[in-house]
Curated annotation (Swiss-Prot):
NCBIfam families: L31, PRK00528.1. InterPro entries: Ribosomal_bL28/bL31-like_sf, Ribosomal_bL31, Ribosomal_bL31_A, Ribosomal_bL31_sf. This is Large ribosomal subunit protein bL31. Keywords: Ribonucleoprotein, Ribosomal protein, RNA-binding, rRNA-binding. Pfam families: Ribosomal_L31 (PF01197). Belongs to the bacterial ribosomal protein bL31 family. Type A subfamily.
Length: 77
C-alpha cells in the first residue's frame, strides 16, 4: 500500500438542527471543526412526513431572480 495517500481522519463536532451536539471522526475540515446540519433525521421530510422549504443563504431567492424571465407567459400579459 502507498504511503501518504490517505486524507487525515480526525475528530469533528456535529450540530444537529435542534442543537444536539456529538463528536465523530471525519476527513472534513480540520480537527475540532464544527459541521452544522441544515437537515438531519429529526427534520428530514422522508422521516417526519412534513415538507419544509430550506433556503440556505438566499439561494432560492437568487435562483428565482436569475431566471424570472424564463417562465411561460400567460394570456393576461
Amino acid at each position: 500500500m502507498k504511503d501518504n495517500i490517505h486524507p487525515d481522519y480526525h475528530e469533528i463536532n456535529v450540530v444537529m438542527t435542534d442543537g444536539t451536539e456529538y463528536k465523530t471522526r471525519s476527513t472534513m475540515g480540520k480537527a475540532g471543526d464544527t459541521l452544522r446540519l441544515d437537515i438531519d433525521p429529526k427534520s428530514h421530510p422522508a422521516w417526519t412526513g412534513v415538507h419544509r422549504m430550506v433556503d440556505t443563504a438566499g439561494q432560492l431567492a437568487k435562483f428565482k431572480k436569475r431566471f424570472e424571465g424564463f417562465g411561460i407567459k400567460s394570456d393576461n400579459s
